[in-house]
Amino acid sequence: EGWRESGGKRYYIKNGAPLVGWHYVKCNGSTYYYYFDKDGAQVKDLFAHFGKSYMKKKMVVNVNRPNHTVDMLLYNSKTKKYDIPAKSFVTTTPEENAHFKTGSYKLTYRRRWWSFTNPDSKKTSYYQYATRVQGTYGALIHSSRYTAKSVKALAWKTYNNLGANRSYYCIRVQCGNAKLIYDCVGYQGSGKVLCKFSNSKTKGPNGKVTIANSGGKVKAGTKMDPTDPAAKK
């Protein structure tokens, strides 16, 4: 009975059988509305499974610093809560505690490429699919670092460091996930997608997500983020 992991998939066993379809299930102290496929495996990416219509749904992007996990939760009109786990992924958060201000914000403007010059090192870096977290001092959600404005200029070490406190103000995620957030905001318009910064040690609906369970680290010298849609062409 309860949650089971098998072959990289996650199931919920009730009365000796895995749940199928939509179900309210408890995880890490909260109840969420999960979707399980016909074989009973939890569908961990509702956007990929159900298509673009899900990118237009009311949602909150929860950024959890202690667990280095982003949980995208959809609004449930029946419970009046953001309790539908759409996707969870690994993140790098700011090094300084003061640069990560907890609270509720909105995602506003977007940039296909964002450049940032570190005030300490004076080094300029480039990031793909950047979305501004309005209300924070300077945070954006974007890809890992690039050494030039090119999809083939990935700073592979920063990709491999996903899942730590290593950024200045921003929230770094895999390129494919940065684009997902960027696209959701594109569909919904500025200020419609909510974002929450949390310092809670409680894990979310999919637990702690790491680079190890997100495709693993890339080889030294890798030039493209493996999750980048451009890498799949």
Regions inferred by a protein language model and the residue ranges of each:
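Intrinsic-disorder/low-complexity loop/linker signature
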Residues: 8, 29-30, 40, 80, ...
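Exported/periplasmic cell-wall-interacting domains
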Residues: 114-233
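Short, surface-exposed beta-edge/turn micro-motifs
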Residues: 8-10, 31-33, 56-58, 67, ...
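Short, flexible beta-strand-to-coil junctions
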Residues: 8, 15-16, 38-39, 63-67, ...
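Extracellular adhesion/carbohydrate-binding repeat motifs centered on closely spaced tryptophans
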Residues: 1-57
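Well-ordered beta-strand positions in beta-sheet-rich domains
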Residues: 3, 10, 22, 33, ...
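Conserved hydrophobic/aromatic positions in well-ordered beta-strands
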Residues: 11, 34, 71-73, 131, ...
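Gly/Pro-biased beta-strand-loop elements
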Residues: 50-152
